[in-house]
Amino acid sequence: EKIGSTGSGTGPANSDRAMRVLKLAKDFDSLSSLVVDVPLEINSAISANENVLIEGTQGTFLSLWHGTYPFVTSKDVTASGICADVGIGPTKVDEVIVVFKSYVTRVGTGPLDKELSLEDAEKKGWSEFGTVTGRQRRAADFDFDLARRAIMLNGATQISITKLDVLFSECEGKTSYDELSEDAKAFVKNIEDELNTPVTIIGTGPGVYDVVDRRN
């Protein structure tokens, strides 16, 4: 069964690096002016008390080490793996924010517990298409077991919830927690209680500023 790769070349590149046959950007004269010492740059910024945000890609369970193998990507995508990618040690990290969608989606093959039919997903407004592949995403209700394990694997200290407005349309564009409906607040509170982790950032729409920020 095909895994459903994006076909972007990342897997072959990671494979070549593991085999130590990959040429790096620094090996090409045309790219040499664009190459910097990323670990030095990032650690220097941290030492200077600058704010540094490191954003990872993909979902926890696409991790090569901790995901639903073999239906995974070609590297580790957990918080520890992301830090290793840019060259910072674990003691340099203050906060780990894990991002959950208000429901679960998956592109391509692989397990998806309590998966909805495409028809039911469309009725709920959960019909989505992958930004890279253009393939339709499969959907399921929020999975507390997956979320709990993601919290553990990433050492999360905060939770960000996206697409709350898809579940609760009355919350679209809201920027204050007090403006959210009681049903939406109950949904957020249940996540906090079940996962014992605060929900600090809530997405309420597609716009950059469609966000409820509960951080001090």
Role assignments for model-derived ranges:
Residues 1-216:
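Non-transmembrane, aqueous-exposed alpha-helical and coiled segments at domain scale
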